[in-house]
């Protein structure tokens, strides 16, 4: 499986069979230009959307025809297993920012979880629903999502082998959110990949307890 960090909360996941999945595609220039990433040129077979905010739901502007999943439930498409777990965008059961769907993507013997704009601590029922995770794509910037401390708690609850942070402030994301360094501080096993793409297989995943890989946005 290949994972490419496109920017913000958008990733391209390509399975060994060539199925292409894009998570939370952003609208370039959203929020008065706060989202400064270039338009996404990648084609996709499947798009997962965690919630209906413009920096996460711009499937309509992707090239080609895609199948969009934006509701909780269990699905299978082109040999990829998809599970949408209902969570919230805030810590008040959605009263401030509404619902959020955490997506578990199963392919190539791997379970990849994209948490979207998770804004709450996971309860036992959520951990059970998500299930065992190999790769966790997690927001860490706070303000609109869990912050560095909250993200650390979620990592400890889900126990993935590989953690890839997302949804943090960068020169191309000028939202009022924190930089990734707050999440990385005092953590062991941090690797700055120096690129946008990684290849992962069950045999090449980090062993124990987990590693954090920081990717550079491709766009």
For every predicted segment, state its role.
Residues 1-17, 27, 79, 83-85, ...:
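Zn-dependent metallo-beta-lactamase
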Residues 91-158, 175, 179:
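Active-site-proximal loop/helix segments of hydrolase catalytic cores
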């Amino acid at each position: 499986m290949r994972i490419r960090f496109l920017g913000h909360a958008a990733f391209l996941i390509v399975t060994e069979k060539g199925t292409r999945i894009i998570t939370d595609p952003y609208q370039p220039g959203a929020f008065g230009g706060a989202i400064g990433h270039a338009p996404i040129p990648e084609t996709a077979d499947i798009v997962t959307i965690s919630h209906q905010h413009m920096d996460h739901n711009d499937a309509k502007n992707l090239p080609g025809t895609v199948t969009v999943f934006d509701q909780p439930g269990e699905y299978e498409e082109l040999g990829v297993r998809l599970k949408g777990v209902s969570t919230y965008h805030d810590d008040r059961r959605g009263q401030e920012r509404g619902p959020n769907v955490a997506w578990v993507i199963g392919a190539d013997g791997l379970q990849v979880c994209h948490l979207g704009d998770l804004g709450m601590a996971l309860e036992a029922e959520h951990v059970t629903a998500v299930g065992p995770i190999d790769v966790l794509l997690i927001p860490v910037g706070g303000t609109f999502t869990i912050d560095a401390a909250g993200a650390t708690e979620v990592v400890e609850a889900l126990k993935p082998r590989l953690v890839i942070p997302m949804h943090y402030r960068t020169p191309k994301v000028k939202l009022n959110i924190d930089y990734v360094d707050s999440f990385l501080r005092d953590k062991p096993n941090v690797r700055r990949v120096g690129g946008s793409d990684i290849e992962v297989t069950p045999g090449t995943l980090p062993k124990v307890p987990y590693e954090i890989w920081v990717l550079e946005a491709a766009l």
